[in-house]
């Protein structure tokens, strides 16, 4: 069985997150993808994100009646910062023994993975799916695969080479690193927060129930 771990702040969750998750699920034939809100993201400053309970509730509303996508509270139940290596180890201990677990992250996040706690262990333990949206800010001058190629050679080393046959980067003693292009929806949590603060509509950027919750709670004002 194949499972995906898709972590993030989800501040708030939006249709870009959900569409990317669905496309990855179908593209890699995953049984289920767990969307995992971070309680205290190590790379975020206090006050930059709303309460974890609110972000969790928005995710639950967004995923109502969505087969194959579910919310995990594992990082919210952990004290201290949320580190991906700890989350991976948790799922390895609770999912069926022969499961393949994929770590799903955006291209921008992956290009900073060498700053993560125990990132070398991640590269050894789990295959990674790097989501690339065509025409993203960092993709204007170079295509996603070119950025990835430069980064792997300059920052991660390890002898990664791109396999045309398997459409991923391979290295001895490391798990594969896949680049997966998803539909380029021009939606970001930053933009949504800005629109809410300006009193403008966020319709069709987030699920309807999520938008209603944001307004009812007075979030991002």
Go through each PLM region and give its residues:
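Nucleotidyltransferase catalytic core that binds NTPs
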Residues: 1-221
């Amino acid at each position: 069985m194949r499972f995906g771990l898709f972590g993030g702040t989800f501040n708030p969750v939006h249709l870009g997150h959900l569409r990317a998750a669905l496309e990855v699920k179908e593209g890699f034939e995953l049984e289920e993808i767990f969307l995992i809100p971070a309680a205290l993201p190590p790379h975020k400053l206090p006050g930059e994100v709303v309460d974890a309970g609110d972000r969790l509730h928005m995710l639950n509303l967004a995923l109502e009646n969505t087969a194959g996508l579910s919310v995990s509270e594992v990082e919210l139940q952990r004290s201290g910062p949320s580190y991906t290596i700890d989350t991976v180890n948790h799922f390895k201990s609770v999912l069926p023994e022969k499961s393949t677990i994929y770590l799903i992250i955006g291209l921008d996040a992956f290009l900073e993975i060498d700053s993560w706690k125990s990132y070398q262990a991640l590269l050894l333990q789990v295959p990674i799916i790097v989501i690339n949206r065509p025409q993203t800010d960092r993709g204007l001058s170079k295509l996603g695969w070119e950025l990835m190629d430069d980064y792997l050679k300059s920052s991660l080393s390890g002898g990664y080479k791109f396999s045309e046959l398997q459409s991923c980067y391979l290295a001895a003693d490391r798990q594969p690193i896949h680049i997966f292009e998803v539909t380029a929806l021009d939606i970001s949590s930053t933009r949504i927060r800005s629109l809410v603060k300006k009193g403008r509509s966020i319709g069709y950027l987030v699920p309807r129930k999520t938008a209603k919750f944001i307004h009812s709670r007075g979030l991002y004002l």
